[in-house]
């Protein structure tokens, strides 16, 4: 039986720690300085011998240590320091596992036992971090195995080579007259259309696409997010009868939700509204890339003029690929958010995919207001707060201006996390998307979400007309996403191979026209 949540993991780092586990008394932020990592030269790779130590298996020669370190920590993805307790890990995860074994600690998860563990969030949940350590094979018994077998050495050497090649591509400095390298390369087979259409449905189901299992460069774009467990929430059946909210079309409460087939608006209890609002808010907070408080604390960390010029001097295709990667990362969190919304997983798979293809970027733009600083007109991007000038090399200044104008406008509404969550869910569950099979079912779900949003706005004593202002943003969001598609298609017409080979599969699945026929419904 699990005990009460333990105190945060002591942050004292062992010698040689990468610095992701902060010093005692400090707090790790999710905003790592990627530029520091990019400056590290790729390590040479040679075959090496290994010996067992009291703490695990480590490289015998100090000069060979960096060969193992090129493989990231299997627990959190930070820079590794060797093989510890049978697994390649960083110093922080090695120390965490050692302390957990020495103290026989029992941790509890304050959420749903499926927390994402990476270098930015590993200290937030000790239970899930320990479970991941055990899942990848960390064990005190691993130190007893002695020398590695030839098969193990060959496998490790192959992995080192693969990561070295990837790092060389990432860290290679652009030479005069040479184009900055693009990485990774995605191999599209003759039937790639069907396979990539399957990527999104597999991702919704919580499975990593088969193609990405074979290539870690591809899988790096699919976050290690476990399938969402069943939502427990409130026990509606155990709640005493509450006042009934009977909202009808005549009352004007649903001016933004169309009714088809003679359907009437739902009759919803206050308890059900509270439950839905709590479910969506909780799902939102659990699937945000960054904590709002942490983002607000580093708004002063803007790009220097020299750094801005570095972005401006990037090749257009390189900057496009970087933005595609960042958008894809954000969308992965939106997919997980959708999966946790009560009712979404009960929709047919076709409708789940249609809603995500149509609405995921809209939700990304809504969430952007959390990372937008209206005072200096910057948004969090690639480790710091960026002005529109950072994106100049994309070649679409009008679109970037549109994005920043929307971010500033939504930010000026000062939405709470609950309000952002419910508005995001409302936008995502739009019943007017093309190719939906169960429009009425989605309509009813969206209507309930709108009621919950109205309920929260009233509880927060927001001014009259705030809901109308929010709903008016929907048309702006769609125009914004339409502009994104136009710019992408223009770029793709010039650089078709760049998009085909170097853009993340999920991004292409969502936004490029070559995948749209897969969504069509017969009849």
From Swiss-Prot:
Changing residue 183 to A: Greatly increased transcriptional activity. Decrease in repression by NR1D1. GO terms for biological process: angiogenesis; cellular response to hypoxia; cellular response to interleukin-1; cellular response to sterol; cellular response to tumor necrosis factor; cerebellar granule cell precursor proliferation; cerebellar Purkinje cell differentiation; cGMP metabolic process. The modification Phosphothreonine is found at residue 183. Phosphorylation by conventional PKCs in neurons inhibits transcriptional activity. Phosphorylated on Thr-183 by MAPK1/ERK1 in vitro. Changing residue 288 to Q: Less effect on transcriptional activity with cholesterol sulfate as substrate as compared to cholesterol as substrate. A motif (AF-2) lies at residues 506-523. Widely expressed in a number of tissues. Expressed in both regulatory T-cells (Treg) and effector T-cells (Teff). Isoform 4: Highly expressed in the central nervous system, including in the cerebellum. The keyword Transmembrane helix does not apply. Gene3D superfamilies: Erythroid Transcription Factor GATA-1, subunit A, Retinoid X Receptor. Residues 73-138 bind DNA. It holds the Pfam family Hormone_recep. Changing residue 476 to A: No effect on cerebellar development, when assayed in a heterologous system. Residues 272-510 form the NR LBD domain. Keywords: Activator, Biological rhythms, Developmental protein, Disease variant, DNA-binding, Epilepsy, Intellectual disability, Isopeptide bond, Metal-binding, Methylation, Nucleus, Phosphoprotein, Receptor, Transcription, Transcription regulation, Ubl conjugation, Zinc, Zinc-finger. It is linked to Intellectual developmental disorder with or without epilepsy or cerebellar ataxia: An autosomal dominant neurodevelopmental disorder that manifests with variable features of mild-to-severe intellectual disability, developmental delay, autism spectrum disorder, cerebellar ataxia and epilepsy. Belongs to the nuclear hormone receptor family. NR1 subfamily. This is Nuclear receptor ROR-alpha. It comes from Homo sapiens (Human). The lineage of its organism: Eukaryota, Metazoa, Chordata, Craniata, Vertebrata.
